[in-house]
Amino acid sequence: MSHHYVVTAQKPTAVVACLTGNFTSPTDLNLIIARNNQVEIDLVTPEGLRPLKEININGTIAVMRHFRPPDSNKDLLFILTRRYNVMILEARMVNDVITVVTKANGNVSDSVGIPSEGGVIAAIDPKARVIGMCLYQGLFTIIPMDKDASELKATNLRMDELNVYDVEFLHGCLNPTVIVIHKDSDGRHVKSHEINLRDKEFMKIAWKQDNVETEATMLIPVPSPIGGVIVIGRESIVYHDGSNYHAVAPLTFRQSTINCYARVSSNGLRYLLGNMDGQLYMLFLGTAETSKGVTVKDIKVEQLGEISIPECITYLDNGFLYIGARHGDSQLVRLNSEAIDGSYVVPVENFTNLAPILDIAVVDLDRQGQGQIITCSGSFKDGSLRIIRIGIGIQEHACIDLPGIKGMWSLKVGVDESPYENTLVLAFVGHTRILTLSGEEVEETEIPGFASDLQTFLCSNVDYDQLIQVTSDSVRLVSSATKALVAEWRPTGDRTIGVVSCNTTQILVASACDIFYIVIEDGSLREQSRRTLAYEVACLDITPLDETQKKSDLVAVGLWTDISAVILSLPDLETIYTEKLSGEIIPRSILMTTFEGIHYLLCALGDGSMYYFIMDQTTGQLTDKKKVTLGTQPTTLRTFRSLSTTNVFACSDRPTVIYSSNHKLVFSNVNLKEVNHMCSLNAQAYPDSLALANKNAVILGTIDEIQKLHIRTVPLGEGPRRIAYQESSQTFAVSTLRIDVHGRGGAKPLRNSASTQAQNITCSSNFLPKPGGGNSTAANAEVGQEIDVHNLLVIDQNTFEVLHAHQFVAPETISSLMSAKLGDDPNTYYVVATSLVIPEEPEPKVGRIIIFHYHENKLTQVAETKVDGTCYALVEFNGKVLAGIGSFVRLYEWTNEKELRMECNIQNMIAALFLKAKGDFILVGDLMRSITLLQHKQMEGIFVEIARDCEPKWMRAVEILDDDTFLGSETNGNLFVCQKDSAATTDEERQLLPELARFHLGDTVNVFRHGSLVMQNVGERTTPINGCVLYGTCNGAIGIVTQIPQDFYDFLHGLEERLKKIIKSVGKIEHTYYRNFQINSKVEPSEGFIDGDLIESFLDLSRDKMRDAVQGLELTLNGERKSADVEDVIKIVEDLTRMH
């Protein structure tokens, strides 16, 4: 049996619907946004959008509409899911908390209906009498509205129109009247139907208009008293009300398809239109008073400016509108009354959207065991790379350019009673600089008692309103009030101070092997004891373990030569415990600290690794030794307080915050490239902040409370499709699609983008034959015709600058990409597969595999081989090129002559779209035949089919979990796991890949990659997870699939079953129903997968509900079976959350 845990690390970001209404109260103006299975409710305020609530739906949202019942003063929400579940939602205030309740729900599916080719469409009558839906061909589904009904019951009305593109209800009609755009053999037509709600049937055709524009796809109903409908086509706009007809054909419309609209004015005279080019238009209806009332006399359209490619638009208020997008970032924009640089559109805020994620690369650029995800996100002009890593963010408030800092401390100087620090001391080689913080101003100053001509080793406020400065020469005690030197201690002889540590009452100084213990008194420094150790001191610490005490009874010392940590007692400096640190790397920083009442000793080494121990406060004994790798450079440990808890900041090339959760240490990366020095700063202008120094500057900022995903955008201006990483050249290769327009002088890019602005640009020689006489190539394109131009971009791994762009001549397209080391060749190559896509051909007949070498800022084509058809997938396979070409899987070897020679192939697929390899085994994902496992017999030079999944599935991605277990995703948003049965007794059983686990994710996975978002092997983990596979989806979600053992699965499954009963979903769709594995009419229960999103919701429950959820649960702890209590389960679930 195969057991897996699947959880979302990044929720879906693509917006599928948005609307504005009075949902939470009659006076609240709400923006409501739907993303896949989530609804976000925001409040529109003068300051901007304020999130109020986020709700999860156990279903994939297909349509979201709002309406206002006749007897209500606020709006209700109607949602239709992909599985035809319907619900009406209402917001209510319960104990001053907004609660979304399900007023009515139901399922409107039909077991014999043929799904509509135009997709799922729904509309609501303006008087809220009926909801109408086009779900199946030839049927119009209605739900009559009954305010007292809790169940939504549907009736199907027979409809002559089969191919329906849009449906709306007309305003101002006595009976509900629906209008449709449909298509038949004669063209596209608009027709209206009046509905008899009592008999639940169509009464008559109110009016119709035959032969509208052949590409008309959208209807806009016009409110009363004007009435009628606006028909939006590719080239024209028509207004029609049955008798009155007006049309306009704006020239700019021909460039792209209008796909969404928003009504601006309640009288229905102004509408915003958005198209697939990301252009925003305003449509004006001109009216006139006649004997029949107000009628439309003309239509005007004005182009306003550029926006993200919209999926939906809603007008908020006062010239603000929200652009919901699924190809790029969603936006809040403002419309200006005057044009600025030809545009009336002013972007106000962008909302990150990763969708659609077509490919991902998981890289560990810093070699820290922590994955950084680079996604190919977005489409067309909104395409980008997104750099995603998990960590703790620093919110930067100020930056001071100061290179060469060797140490940094914050002080409170002067007699001011203010609790705030006002001084920053910066140490440099050979001198010290002092900065005064006055508000947000930073000025250089002096403290007369400090030795400014020497490098400071340590600085601190100490008892009796005094300051300490330690240099290589001496320890200086300075009055905070007068800033004058009041006492000084110097080491005897010609010794110089090398290492120092202090608290508010004690100082510990080391010079080579000698240690001096000094007590701070009022106006004096008293040396109390000294001792010579066997080896030279590398680092030391005198921090009190008890936070309520000012002085410490213990000293921690790190020694050279024998590489050890030594605990000394005070005041006599006697050795009470010695811990040998294995290896030859010296300790560079040592720290005693207390987390959640447990005392620890942390000891960081010169190679970026760190040992940590539990420490006995009385005996100094160190136990429970553990080691983690935090960076690659020497690490300095400093404490700071955040939210009244102690934390440790590890300064290095990979800065890390160390804290404790449930009595376990947690190590979280900080999203800064490098931090050499750090100190707490609580200044008036920068309260509860940190000062962080790198080699060039000081950053003043605040630290996030929790670790989370941090996303950086690299805009490309064209659509990225595939990505590969090459460590040897420190570059990424990205294949992109750019849209050019054919003009009189040839093809021209529509806009500047990554491929047009690269440092170097080359163009492919189009050696390929031109089928059909070449009449489809770019050279013979018509003026104004759009041309797909594919590019290979080489991008620097650190700066993400486009170093080289290689353009392929249309109609040659890039279908696959990888980086590979081939044969005995010392070079690493980029391997690119292309195909010739001719519109007149059902599928490409010819393509090529090209070998590129990037070296010394030059991209050189080394070799190429012609292939028959499209190469959908490339994989490096034991130093060879494995390719899925049409229905073949082929293996090419790299010869000494730098040529690709086909070694073997196998043909038993419809289309080999996806390939993964491990050892001699190859996993093939087929277009519609699920997955097949092949083995390469090296001695015979052949492929052999080992086993296959005989259940047909339209595949989207595959991955090898281990030698016998294989993960797949298919087009209906399902995940499944098949397992090879090596112990099978018959050949027939051995040739099958039985499906052992299945799960409905509710989103289509496009790519799987092995890797982790968090640092591996860091800290203590109680959850027995094995391996980690990341996935990216169409809707911009990133998730994790990991394997778990049987007993842990049983425990989590028990918790999952209890949570299903305790957590009531909005919309009343059962969790079990939602996660059912469904392909067309075939439905199977979810099995072998644990829903991590549901498990993690345990942490959001009240304590009473937590107790209910764990009642009767048993778990195994330290080899013993016991009844689970709330604390046990909290620890386990929190541990699971640390995967992301």
From Swiss-Prot:
GO biological process: DNA damage response; DNA repair; eggshell chorion gene amplification; negative regulation of smoothened signaling pathway; positive regulation of protein catabolic process; proteasome-mediated ubiquitin-dependent protein catabolic process; protein ubiquitination; ubiquitin-dependent protein catabolic process
The keyword DNA-binding is assigned to this record: yes
Keyword terms: Cytoplasm, DNA damage, DNA repair, DNA-binding, Nucleus, Ubl conjugation pathway
Entry's localization field: Cytoplasm; Nucleus
GO cellular component terms given for this protein: cytoplasm; nucleus; site of double-strand break
SUPFAM superfamilies reported for this sequence: WD40 repeat-like
Associated pathway: Protein modification; protein ubiquitination
GO molecular function, one term: DNA binding
Gene inactivation effect: Reduced tissue growth in the wing imaginal disk.
Task performed by this protein: Protein, which is both involved in DNA repair and protein ubiquitination, as part of the UV-DDB complex and DCX (DDB1-CUL4-X-box) complexes, respectively. Core component of the UV-DDB complex (UV-damaged DNA-binding protein complex), a complex that recognizes UV-induced DNA damage and recruit proteins of the nucleotide excision repair pathway (the NER pathway) to initiate DNA repair. The UV-DDB complex preferentially binds to cyclobutane pyrimidine dimers (CPD), 6-4 photoproducts (6-4 PP), apurinic sites and short mismatches.
Family recorded in the similarity comment: Belongs to the DDB1 family.
Description of how the protein assembles with itself and partners: Component of the UV-DDB complex which includes DDB1 and DDB2; the heterodimer dimerizes to give rise to a heterotetramer when bound to damaged DNA. The UV-DDB complex interacts with monoubiquitinated histone H2A and binds to XPC via the DDB2 subunit. Component of numerous DCX (DDB1-CUL4-X-box) E3 ubiquitin-protein ligase complexes which consist of a core of DDB1, CUL4A or CUL4B and RBX1. DDB1 may recruit specific substrate targeting subunits to the DCX complex.
Descriptive protein name: DNA damage-binding protein 1
